[in-house]
Design a protein with these regions (language model features):
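FIC/Doc superfamily catalytic core
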Residues: 2-176
């Protein structure tokens, strides 16, 4: 369609400027997709089983919340959501505690995987920091404002470097 915007770096419209959400710019957290489409509830359950095995805890379900969370998950799998909406949903799942143990680790792991795929174009160190910020927010150890600031600033800085607007030190230029 002629009126559709091309999708570019980290899901932001492909146009000059950074994806960090400045005036007239789209935040990378506004990228929309069916982020949970290929992540079944069975996968989430297996991630929790792995976290419990690693942590030496018994895997099991919270009878009061597991069914509701699983049905909400199935519903969200079919929806196109922004990354921010998806992250908020993962945080709600963590707080809903559908498993006996390691809910934070489980849903943070899903968020980390999504961020790793979506921000694959970022330099490795920045991508890891974005993944960490998103995971820590989902797990409840980082506030929303800080997470948004970290994600947007790392994407903005990376975009400036990728476009050559930042003079790299000689050692960094040599390694490129």
């Amino acid at each position: 369609m002629g009126d559709e915007t091309e999708i570019g770096f980290a899901g932001a419209p492909d146009r000059p400027g950074h994806p960090g959400g400045g005036p007239g710019e789209q935040s990378p957290l506004q990228a929309r997709a069916q982020f949970l489409k290929n992540r079944s509830w069975e996968l989430v359950t297996s991630l929790n089983q792995g976290a419990c095995a690693t942590g030496g805890a018994q895997h099991g379900f919270n009878r009061e919340t597991q069914e509701t969370c699983a049905s909400e998950w199935a519903e969200k799998q079919t929806q196109s959501l922004s990354l921010e909406e998806t992250i908020e949903f993962l945080r709600r799942c963590h707080r809903g505690a559908p498993f006996l143990f390691f809910n934070g680790n489980t849903f943070a792991d899903v968020g980390r995987q999504l961020a790793g795929a979506l921000f694959a174009d970022l330099p490795t160190g920045r991508r890891r920091e974005v993944m960490s910020a998103i995971a820590h927010y989902i797990a409840g150890v980082l506030d929303r404002e800080s997470m948004v600031e970290i994600v947007e600033s790392l994407c903005e800085a990376a975009e400036f470097i990728l476009r050559g607007e930042v003079e790299l030190p000689p050692a960094a230029r040599a390694s490129k």
